[in-house]
Amino acid sequence: VGYAARSGMEFVTIYLGPSLVMIGWWWFLRKLVRVGRTQRVTSVADLISSRYGKSNVLAIVVTVMAVIGVTPYIALQLQSVTLSLSIFSDPTGTTDGGMNLVSAGFWVALGLALFTVLFGTRNLNANERHNGVVIAIAVEAVVKLVALLAVGIFVVWGVAGGLSEMMTHIDNSEIGQWQVDGSRWTALTVLSGAAFLCLPRMFQVLVVENDDERHLHIASWAFPIYLMMMSLFVVPIAVVGLDLLPENSNPDLFVLTVPLSQGQGGLAILSFLGGFSSATSMVIVATLALSTMVSNHVVMPIWLSFQGHGATVSGDVRNVVIFARRVSILVIIALGYLYYRVSGGSGALAAIGLISFIGVAQFLPAMIGGIFWRGGTRVGALTGLLVGFAIWIYTSLLPSFGPDVVLSSTLLEQGPFGIGWLRPQALFGIKGIDPTVHAVLWSLLLNTSGFILGSLISFPKPLERLQGAQFVNVFAHSGHAHGWSGSAAQSEDLMVMAQRILGGPEAQKLFRREAQNQGHDRYLPEPTPDFLQRVEREMSASVGAATAHAMISQLVGGASVSVQDLMAVADESAQMLEYSNQLEAKSSELLDTARQLRDVNAKLTQISVQKDAFLSQISHELRTPMTSIRSFSEILRDGNEL
């Protein structure tokens, strides 16, 4: 509503991007969900690192980027909750009503952190722990929709006097006069669609929690309808709020302040509950997803490096992971509160959200390229991510704090060291465009360019090529296991490690079932490549693909690629070499043909020269007697005496 009051119909782009993704990119979502299920990914960092050779370095980079990128998003939710609380002490929404918003934000952040720690980290397996959270998200979505529809119906028929009167109000309001900026609309639509795919919260719900691809068929039409209903009364509420409330009222709070100004306290409370539940669920799911990424891709690799080879058989890894996730939750929410404090907590909610959208959108090139292009490499993904993230920080995140907070006003206006074409919001001399469009343009353009160029100049490792084949051709490889040779592994060591990660009952159940499948009466199965792959995937659901791969590697002795996989790579290389030889042969034939054409052309040129010389000589011989005959004829004609 606040976005509509400030920018007119531009708020539609925030709903348009996700709707277009659900309607037009359902085939991409289906492939993404299939990859997530077959690879047992736990987060967007797990997806990207698993695709590019299960790289720990890449996983750490994506995790750090996600934490920093989502920090403004968490600050946005804290600001939303604290502003909503302040309304009940000042119904006009013009001041803070005597409430210390910074102090209130601290207590809100602390409460959300404690709730998330207590109820979000009781279990370890990422594929089992969030069923209740998903139900809570569905409930809060319904509550938010009901609250917004109730306020909208009250505004249209209870305040404006009916639909026709409401349309007249809209036509006469400032919102009806807003001009459409094509470049900004395009950028925001792309940005919202990218954020829909890349936000850790959305990825968690869309991919990690999705256990059936058929759910996408329902979501492809149900979710756009939900967004349409959410946006149905946004403009009427914004128009009535601008008409009824004081000029300095906060438009982000019109959903609360308009009912309160009309004496509808119950409706305002319903609206508050809808907004509060929405904000808290966003914070909880976002921090859960981020804490999983931090524990799996930052804490566990560091812990394993200190523990050495004994890390797989000693110590309770489950306790380490759970403790790391709890600490990560506290740190992540603390970072959100710190951003809220430093930025002053006074910016428009939508503007703060766009900053996070641009940050997480940097995952999109590596994600799409990894799923559709086998040529993408770890070097390319890392290059694109680092370049895009650096541009986002410089052009969007740091300027959002305001002048003279992080970046000086001189640097913002003149550029570093007076270099004008390096100004954060006029990079490379491009001036006069919207700051959001500017940040989206340069960050995604340079990110994609870095990804493509880095992939073209680097050669993927065998595991990268195997993972690339499984991602790109996921529907053909979903049921195939690749990657391990179990000759160096011991079943007893695998059992101890699995118990540390999965827990005793789950590990015993897994090993007993595998022994039965192999036809053994023994308790422990043979460490076949298929079984090693199954253990790795089960562990990846708890500690991430990269960490699980590293732990299995310690037991197997580093034999992370089987002979069959190496043969597959060799076959592929042979095919590429044969194709290259065919191209070389074709090129040689074309060169021979071109040489023959040049020889023929030279002969034709020589013949043409000879022809011209011959014609010139014949013409001279012909012209001489003909001239004489003509002269004598004229003399005979004119000379009668002769």
PLM regions with names:
Residues 602-638:
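Primarily the dimerization/phosphotransfer
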Residues 1-40, 49, 155, 187-195, ...:
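Membrane-interface helix-loop-helix modules in multi-pass membrane proteins
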Residues 300-306, 400-525, 529:
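Terminal cytosolic tails of multi-pass membrane transporters
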Residues 30, 34, 151-171, 222-257, ...:
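Extracellular/periplasmic helix-exit of transmembrane alpha-helices
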Residues 2-15, 77-102, 131-136, 250-257, ...:
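Transmembrane helix-loop boundary segments of multi-pass membrane transporters
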Residues 561-613, 617:
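Amphipathic alpha-helical coiled-coil "transmission" helices that mediate dimerization
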Residues 67-97, 101-108, 115-120, 124, ...:
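Hydrophobic alpha-helical segments and their helix-loop junctions in multi-pass secondary transporters
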Residues 12-126, 187-195, 204, 277-285, ...:
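Helix-loop-helix module between adjacent transmembrane segments
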